[in-house]
Every structure is written in C-alpha cells, then in structure tokens.
Amino acid sequence: MAASTGYVRLWAAARCWVLRRPLLAVTGGRVPSASGSWLRRGCRVCDTSTPWGGRVPMGGGQWRGLWDAGSRGGSDETSEGGVEDGATASSGEGPVVTALAPMTVPDVFPHLPLIAISRNPVFPRFIKIVEVKNKKLVELLRRKVRLAQPYVGVFLKRDDNNESDVVESLDEIYHTGTFAQIHEMQDLGDKLRMIVTGHRRIHISRQLEVEPEGLEPEAENKQKSRRKLKRGKKEVGDELGAKPQLEMVTEATSDTSKEVLMVEVENVAHEDFQVTEEVKALTAEIVKTIRDIIALNPLYRESVLQMMQAGQRVVDNPIYLSDMGAALTGAESHELQDVLEETNILKRLYKALSLLKKEFELSKLQQRLGREVEEKIKQTHRKYLLQEQLKIIKKELGLEKDDKDAIEEKFRERLKELVVPKHVMDVVDEELSKLALLDNHSSEFNVTRNYLDWLTSIPWGRQSDENLDLARAQSVLEEDHYGMEDVKKRVLEFIAVSQLRGSTQGKILCFHGPPGVGKTSIARSIARALGREYFRFSVGGMTDVAEIKGHRRTYVGAMPGKIIQCLKKTKTENPLVLIDEVDKIGRGYQGDPSSALLELLDPEQNANFLDHYLDVPVDLSKVLFICTANVTDTIPEPLRDRMEMINVSGYVAQEKLAIAERYLVPQARTLCGLDESKAQLSATVLTLLIKQYCRESGVRNLQKQVEKVLRKAAYKIVSGEAQTVHVTPENLQDFVGKPVFTVERMYDVTPPGVVMGLAWTAMGGSTLFVETSLRRPQPSGSKEDKDGSLEVTGQLGDVMKESARIAYTFARAFLMEQDPENDFLVTSHIHLHVPEGATPKDGPSAGCTIVTALLSLALGQPVLQNLAMTGEVSLTGKVLPVGGIKEKTIAAKRAGVTCIILPAENRKDFSDLAPFITEGLEVHFVEHYRDIFRIAFPLREHQEALAVER
C-alpha cells in the first residue's frame, strides 16, 4: 500500500535529515551544485547529500558508505548519477537502505511508475513518506532504482477507504498528480519504505504496459558503456533525457493486467500571471493567516517559522505560497486535490486562503476548548485545596472529626440500641480496624465501608409488636377478602398458638390455586392482621442464586440477596415475606435458585442463614414466609415438603357476585371518579357479566370488565351524553361488547358415544366432552380385518393417551362380560376425539369418561342427561381418586349438571365443600366401573330387569 505518515515540510525542523536543508531553490542567479560547479539561471538542483557523510545504516547499527559527494570535487560525474552512485546494500542484517546520489531532475520524463496514495496528495517541493507492498510495483521500483531512474508519479485515489497500492483502472484516481523523485528507499523485503520529493504537477495521458524483466540486462550494458565516456554538462543532460528509453514500455492493450503500474504523463504548466495588487493582497493575507495559525497552534510554529525565515522568496513566490498554505491544513482530500489541479494562480491562492481560514477557525476553537478545560481544572484544583485546608483548620479547632472517625462513630451509633450477637460484633470491630488503616481514595476502602453499612443496617434483635387479638385479626381478614376460609382459619390458628406460647415463631405457608383468586392480596391482609411488616419479591423466571443468597464481596457492585434487603427495608426480624410465583422459578448457569430456597424455607436451618455477601449467620426463624403458586407439580419435591400447602380454589358465581358487590364495584367507582348516584350496576347486570363474560375461576377478568363499564359511563357523563348512567341487561353490550360465552355447554342433549367429563387446569375447573365415532363401516362376514383399532385426537398428552388405551382395553373386556354377543369394540375402527384441539390436555382423570363413551357407542344408547363424571380407571375396572374436586364441582354446577360421579376415595374432599356449592347436585361415589355403568345407563338396567322378570 501507499501509506502516508503525513507531510514532511521542506523547511521544518523535523527529525529526518532531508529536512535540514532546502531541497529546491528557485534563484535569480547562479548557484553552486552539489559537486561545487555552477549552474545557469533557472536550473533546478536536488540536494540529497546526507549529514552522515554518505553512509547508510547496515544491520546491527552500522552504516554503509554509498557515495562520497565531497571526494568527487567538481567532476561532471556528480550530476550524472548511475548504478555506482545509487547502490543497494545487499549484505548485513536488518532492512536495506538505498540512498540515491545527487542528480539533476529532468524537465521531461514521460513514462513513470504509478503510486496511488490516500488522503493527502503530494505538493511540489514537499516530501512524503510512502510505503509500497504490492509485489509487482515493488519489483518495478527496484528495477527503476537500479537503472538510475528514481522517479515516480504520485496520484491521489478517489476513494479514501481503498488501501491498495495500485489501482485497477485510471478512473479510480485523480489524473492530476505530482512528479516525485525517490530520495531514499528502505527495502524491508515484503515492502518498500521511500522518502519521495515532489517536483512538479503532471497529468496522465494513458496507461502503459510494463515489459518483462528479461530485457533489462541489455539496457544496463548500454548504460554502463555510456557511463565510461566523459561528456560535458550538455551531454549529461541529453543522457538523462534518454534514460526513460532504457525501460521498455508499450501502450496498454485491452487484455492487459488489471493493475495499473506504468503511465504516460505530461507536465502541467500553470497559466501566466502578473503580480497584481490582488495577488499581493492574497499572498499577504495568506502569510498573515499562517502567522495567526502559528500563534494559536504551536504544532506549526517551529516548522513554518524556519520556512519563512529561510528567505523572503517564499513570501514573494505565489506558486509556492499557495501550495504551502494548502499543505499546512488538514482539509478533505478532494479540497487538497482541487488546489493541486488548479492552474490559475489567482484561483489557487483563493482556494489555499479558504482552506487556511478554515484551519484558523478550527485552531481558534481548539484553543478556546483547551482554555475552558484548563480553567475548569484550575477551579477544581483550587476548590480541592481550599477544602483540604478547611478540613485541617476545622480538625485543629476541634470543629470536625476525620472522615474515618465520623464513619466509625456512625456505624457504632447504629448498633447501640441493637442486640448484636458476639460473632457479628467481632466482625464489625475487625472491619472497623481495617477501615482505619485504609486510604480514603482506595477501592478497598469503599468495599469495606459498604460492607459495614449493610452489616450495621440489619435489625439485630429488633422485632415489631405483633397483634395477638383474634377478634381484631378476624375482622381485618373479613374486611379485605371474601371467602378463603381455609387461609383465614390457618392464620387465626397461628395467632392462637402464639398467644398461648407467649412468643411467635416463623412458619412457611404455600397458597396454591388458579390465577386471580387473591393469593397475593391475602398475604398483605395477613401482614396487616398480624401487625407485621410486609415485603414481597417474585422468583418467577429467576435463574441466579445470588438473587437470594447474595454475591461474594470480591465482585464489583456486589450486594446481599433479597432476604437481607428485606430485613434492611422492614427494620424488623419478624416481617411477613411473600415469595411470589414459586412454581415458575427458573434454572440457569448461575445455579438453581430452588435449591437455595431449601435453606431459606427450612425451619431447622434458617435460624443460621448465611448470605454470601455478609458471610455471617442471620436468624430468620421469626420470619413468616408465604409462597404462592398456580400449580404444585412444577415445585421441586424437597421444596414442597418444607412448606405447608393450602389450596385456594376458584369462586362460583355466587361468590363472584358477592366479591363484585362488596369490593370490585366500589374500588372501580373510586378509580373512575364516580359515585353510586351517577353510575348504577345492579346485581342482575353483574350476574349476566359473570355468566357471559367472566367464567374463569378468579375475579381478575371480572374486575377488568367492571372497570371497562364504569370508564365508558364516565366518558358519557363528561361528554354530556347523559347525567347519570344506568347499566341494564339490555344495554350491557354497549359497554362490554358481544358475549364471549353464549351457550352453557357443547351438547344440551348428549347423543350415543358422547359423555361429559370434568377437568382441572391452572385456570380452574372446566367441563370436557369425550366424543367417539366409527372411522369406517364394520366388516360384514369376511374374516379379513376383524381386529378393530382406536385413533385418538385432540392434542392429548402422553398420560392421557395411555389412559385412553387402558380404557379401550377395559371397555372391550367389560362389554364382552355384559353382552358376549356384542363384538362391536373388537371389530370396529373407532375414532376418539376430545374437542378444543388447540388446547393441550393431559392427565389420567378422564379414564372413566372414555370407557363410558366407548360403551355408549357400542350399545347405541346415550348416557343419562346432565351427567358428568371424573376418575381414573385401572385395567381391571377399579376407579382411582383424582384431584381438583372443588374446581370440578364448581365447573359442573356452572354447566348446569345435576348428577356427578366421583371416586369413592374423594368423598372426604367433597365433604369439605361449602353447602352453596353442593346444593342441587346428586353425587354418586363409586369404587368400580360397574357402579358407573348402572348409573350412566339406567335404561339398560331397566331392560335387563324386565328380561329377568319374564
């Protein structure tokens, strides 16, 4: 690549030796050449003698002598340059440096290697460091140097992001560039690093193709034989003019290589101009702007001052001055290229002045910003010094204590009224001693201070006064919640035990039930009834153990877990802590939080709970933990074993109506800014709302619908449509839309093969129909395809599929026992479907329902109408118990069922139900399927009785 390290100004006091002398002088008379001879007016001389006397560095820090300009005296060979004068070091270690001998730069040199650079073009009379990595271009440049043709054309690429040394098309570069001489070349093996000096502007005429290197020896022999002749200065100039012909090039053809290596160029001459008043004014303004930039930005001061002190000809030469002005700026590449391409000197001066003005404004902005930053730093430093002096003065006068003393006093003041265990006090004393030895600004100081802050914020031995009055606690619970008798009874039992013992102990309760039944809200009421502080945190989706047990102090930003945060916030050792959604706890790479809860919720272990951050035992035995969950299946068994499970079941319509009238409607009126006179909802409307819109187990959706009705009522009142709003069953749809539930159940009259079952989900109980039908007609007479089959659909889980297979096997055996001549289930291909296929279903409690549906299809008789059943059936017909009896009973009553069949072992669960739930239900408890068969098919029993009588 042609990488640039920036401009090296001609007159700058830079480190490179080439900057210690002018490389180009435009004189008005004769000047001495490098060899000591005199040149005529207008001749250009490139002085490339080295300050170390013609020696270049070799490997190991040595220098190799390539030429000795002073030993040649006034001979004419000095200006020729040749292979002997520009040699390449071939021995020694390290990079090889080639320093080229002084030579006269030819006025015309049409064929040049092309070097494409980025960002900053090379201006005439300026130096640039260029690196080349392209192999073909590297070989070409080496060949040119060996032939004493150290000249290149440097052109700017149009795309600054292009990092390549060469281009594939001339369209990728600007066609106006600079004719440059390779002043020094350092061969690094895979790349060349060169110092090039710009001499004049050139323009690309066409692309050339490089001939193979095989033609080179002949050219070199001609060159060597030509060098042996001693010629005059004119002959030397002729020879240099003929040198370009030594490298054979041809015009590029259409099938040439993609890379452009050689081009034919022509010199670009500027337009003639007169030194008018306008030109003088522009040059004076440029010089003034440069001096202003020097005054603002010290980076330009040394180089530009030396440049302008070298001679007044710099100021008097508008051509050089315009190039120098543009080169000093950090303008965009296309702006610098525009200056390079401009041939009108007046316009070039204007463009250079414009770029210098922009640079001047930028320098002023930089100076202003630097001054503001420096002033701010001075003020901050002054304020710091004054504060430190004030601290020392106050300390000497006894008005203020040291920071460390104040911190220690604050921490000890916190612990005065607390009963701190001895092992904790030892840790506090040790940390305070360590804090006194630490520097205030060290990171360890802040870590220790934060640790002591947490350690002294724990309410060691401090407890809130509990309410042990049963009557008051019961009134608080009844005031906030309707129903939930099991929960209220358990809380009152806890108060009674505490009253008899004279002290309280912590307990771990778990409320599980459908969403929206009040599990979370009852916990706050319990805290109010007991007089305890309340703290809630949710573990749903938690995957990090550190959320519960804290982080180690070694981590940045470490802090204790939720339990220690709870103690600090509540300021008591006996708060009520609600751990919400314990059935939805996660597991990740940071450990298993459910395992961390084992120590927290174990009454035998939480008296010495160890947080990772505090690293001292904390007593949690007096904390009342209440957990909530929707289902218990996802709670790990060890964790479930440590908790006292209390079922919070869903509500029936009567309970929902009471909750709505007592709690939901008054709360919604308050939120909407209405009173009872402006918006009226009758019990009939609420019943219709519950029946047609809110059939779920909880009351959360009912609360949303009530708020929706009252919001629309408020809108009508504010908009002036009505003064008061009366919601009736007739206009209810105007407030909440079309009814969601229009029918009570799928089948009002069940046909043969269809039986109603009862299901239990996380949302509560529901009715579930099981349908059976023939997939194909029964085989007639032929013995082929005699064995029947059963296909099951309805998105059933693995357990329910196994239950269906068991029911199918038992139904075939039971039918053969009851009616040996009926082989319907043996030979038929039956399809069993559970409707609502989009809803996943699983569980064994549909076994009795499936057997009844298969027998109903085989017998061609419908089951008893308004009959629902639940229970798991074994392979021998025994009916096994199931769960969710309350939810299933509520769902059956909601669907208008009058007869329910339950397993005999669930009698105790049914007996616990409230009378208003079981009222109007005929319940049968069965132990074997024969009992179900007699209840479900009463007509068949009657027919069999008649047959026996006959």
UniProtKB/Swiss-Prot annotation:
What enzyme category does the UniProt record give?
Answer: hydrolase
Note the superkingdom of the native organism. Answer: Eukaryota
A molecular-function term among this protein's GO annotations: ATP-dependent peptidase activity
- EC numbers listed for it are 3.4.21.53
Q: Name one GO cellular component term.
A: nucleoplasm
Instruction: Give a yes or no for keyword Chaperone in this entry.
Output: no
Name all Lon N-terminal domain ranges. 112-360
Q: What residues bind ATP, as annotated? A: 513-520
Record's HAMAP family? lonm_euk (MF_03120)
Q: What is this protein called?
A: Lon protease homolog, mitochondrial
Q: What is the source species?
A: Rattus norvegicus (Rat)
